[in-house]
Regions:
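Charge-rich, low-complexity N-terminal segments
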Residues: 1-120
Length: 120
């Protein structure tokens, strides 16, 4: 059985070497869908009876391990030195420094790496 839980969050970023609008500072409303596969629990009297995993637990783990950190943060590549210097000059600014350029593909791969071990 597969189950999916969708969460949304807002973050800013830029793709520094891109040739179009993406090189400018901007933000998105991101959606992450977490799909888990497993057997349905068949345990009479258990609060998990009939579930693969409690949806509230899926949400809690995602928030603790990814969403709360990235929500309303600016995701910046470590190599984007001008932007990184600027963001570091802002007191209390929520900045997440990444080892990769924050493209949708790289963010998806990072999210998978962070969350895959959480749900095992």
């Amino acid at each position: 059985m597969r189950i999916t839980r969708r969460l949304e969050f807002d973050s800013g970023h830029r793709i520094p070497d891109h040739q179009s609008q993406c090189r400018h500072l901007h933000g998105h409303r991101y959606a992450i869908e977490i799909t888990l596969q497993g057997d349905i629990i068949r345990q009479a009297g258990s609060p998990m009876n009939g579930m693969v995993m409690d949806f509230s637990d899926i949400k809690t783990l995602a928030k603790q391990n990814l969403v709360d950190a990235w929500d309303h943060a600016f995701l910046v590549w470590r190599g984007d030195s001008d932007l990184l210097s600027f963001l570091e000059s802002l007191p209390g600014h929520k900045t997440i420094v990444l080892e990769v350029v924050p493209t949708a593909e790289n963010l998806a791969a990072l999210a998978f790496d962070l969350l895959d071990r959480v749900y095992r």
